[in-house]
Amino acid sequence: MKSFTVIALAAVALLATLGQAKHLDSKVADKDFLMKQKFMYQILQHIYQDDVFTTPFGGSYVEYKPWEHVADYVHPEMLEHFFELWQHQPFTDDMVWSVMYDKHEEYVVGLVRLFYFAKNWETFQHVVYWARQHVNKQLFVYAVTIASLFRDDMQGVVLPAHYEIHPWSYFDSQALEWAEHYKMHGFHHVKQMDNIYNVVIRTNYSNVHGSLNYDHDLAYYLEDVGFNAFYYYFNLDYPFWTKGGEEHVLNKDRRGELYLYVHWQLLARWYLERLSHDLGEVPAFNMYVPTESGYASNLRTYYGVPQWHRENHHSFYHEHNYEHIEHVEMYTQRVMDWIHKNEKFDVETINVLGNIIQGNADSVDKKFYGSLDKLYRFIVNEGHHYGHGDESFPGLFMHYDTSMRDPIFYEVYKTIVSHYWHLMETYPEYHKKDYAFEGVHIDAVHMPESLTTYFEHFDSDISNAVNVEPAVEGSADPLYTFGRNSHYKGSSYVIKARQQRLNHKPFEFTLDVTSDKAQDAVVKVFIGPKYDEHGHEIPLEHNYQNFFELEHFKVHLEAGVNHIKRASGDFSFWVNDRTTYLELYQKLMDATNSDYKFKLDQSEAHCGVPNRMMLPRGKKGGQVFQFFYMVYPYHQPEVAQFTGYDPVVSCGVGHGSRYVDALPFGFPFNRPVKHDYYFDVHNFKFVDVKIFHRDEHTNVV
């Protein structure tokens, strides 16, 4: 029998936002692109300061008012409401913003349209500069990021990591105070490296002085900057308030099904991490009884206002929440009625349910079903009132960049995702014939018997966290004269926040697969628990919801024996750590002033999950988990993958062509497993693996 080595085709995983393919191809930025890149780097620096640009913008920018240039925008009629709203009630930095409030959503919709409808790059620059000077900064960053993701002339433009643009959402107040301290003292005793004042601040998680509860022991996971930034970007890729544009129709990506699957997978990954600490099932959120886990983030706003904290055993059942709770009860009943009246058992039905629960623009009846997603966020936010009228101070749970820090996030979404499982209980159970791949057999799986995780130093550039002086003249600092304005008296500085972040040693697997003929197939890899927190083996009938997808790719099988090899560093939807703001600026300057090539690729794509979060921590003495491997017939998607966009520089959101195949998200675990022996087919294989963890500390004080 012949033997072949199959080179796995890089493909988009089913978990699409975890779902950009890892293309090794790259492009080189031309001069026009570098100009756009430079503008975005300039505009996102020190966002709360309006007068610190080292290369001043001309009078046409300073005097620009978009409502006086309506001819420069497509669909000007769609901007009229925003212009009227802004001129009567501007939303500035003396107001606290959250996209969750209907009133604030009006500004989001108008501002994103304004950026997106700009006819050319010059108009885009002018309106972005206008917004940078006048609009509430969190609103501005949110809107300009969305516009940059969807404008055709911005494809491939690399924005700095959100945790470096807005560090107040990610780093504790002590780290930010130390950053201010070094700056205020003129970087006294700080050595310059390559003519840059270089400060490294040891940054801790919120449990540095002791954990409030068992969940708080996992602050390294809850507060991971890359993981939280991923969730922020996912919700910017698929904003609930829009259907998308003509070329980016979000529902083509099965956005509702994706919404449910992403949160299911986040829950599965959280459960794996909890098991590493001998914690059990994630409790579902109960509005009527006190919540066991409190949380204190140690975060503060740019203006110094500390974020609310919650004590253990806190009750959300009080007068400020009664109305929200009543709405949850009403909409939940309507959703359950819809589920039980449903007579279709296809993927589109799941998509409809996800849209209903999120209450997004593609909901079949948003007025009737509301938004359970939003209502639960309002309940957790508790109606802390500020200002005038009915507005409440938006806490951590009202922002996508901070909501995952709080362990209650997982309790809430366990309740929300339970509606998905209620629906799937009405679907027919998969049988052996649904799982089998006739003529294909996984003969063996070759992978290490043990894997290793550890904590390692990670530096983020938080230079934006401190105020800088207005521009100075006569500086010879090359970065400063190029446009980077993190400086002290004309000399560049960088302030780095150093944290301990989870990581793992690379690993690889090889599948020996026999096929009776040449044919296309897909390979899927999951990791799941083997034992519960008490050491009891978990039957698959009670475990199927806990499997976390690691990889999904297409292969071509030849007749005979195939050896399918894959390294963890090549897994499709995992990305490398983000390049820091300073390093991005240095590369841009070198590419502008020399023959250095500014490469564009997807190795750090915003739509990918940090590679370092792939494996649960495990234990010092080893902890058994199980890998699940599947080889399955290839189902051609309705729209061929990568149609309509360039996967080298784009995540392809809204094109309907992100996915490697047409399988339901999460298959084969997407329906209840009532007979585990149905999984006893030749193209499935479970493999036990021990994960060892080096005994290192997560806080650095």
Swiss-Prot record:
Signal peptide interval: 1-21
Pfam family, one: Hemocyanin_N
GO biological process, one term: synaptic target inhibition
Glycan-bearing residues: 204
Domain of life: Eukaryota
Gene3D superfamilies registered for this protein in UniProt: Di-copper center containing domain from catechol oxidase, Hemocyanin, C-terminal domain, Hemocyanin, N-terminal domain
Location of this chain's protein in the cell: Secreted, Extracellular space
Keyword Transmembrane on entry: no
Record has Signal as a keyword: yes
Membrane-spanning intervals of the chain: none
GO MF terms held by the record: nutrient reservoir activity
Cellular component, GO, one term: larval serum protein complex
Keyword terms of this UniProt record: Glycoprotein, Secreted, Signal, Storage protein
Quaternary assembly: Homohexamer.
Family classification: Belongs to the hemocyanin family.
Function: Larval storage protein (LSP) which may serve as a store of amino acids for synthesis of adult proteins.
Name assigned to this protein: Larval serum protein 2
Organism: Drosophila melanogaster
Lineage per the UniProt record: Eukaryota, Metazoa, Ecdysozoa, Arthropoda, Hexapoda
Name of the coding gene: Lsp2
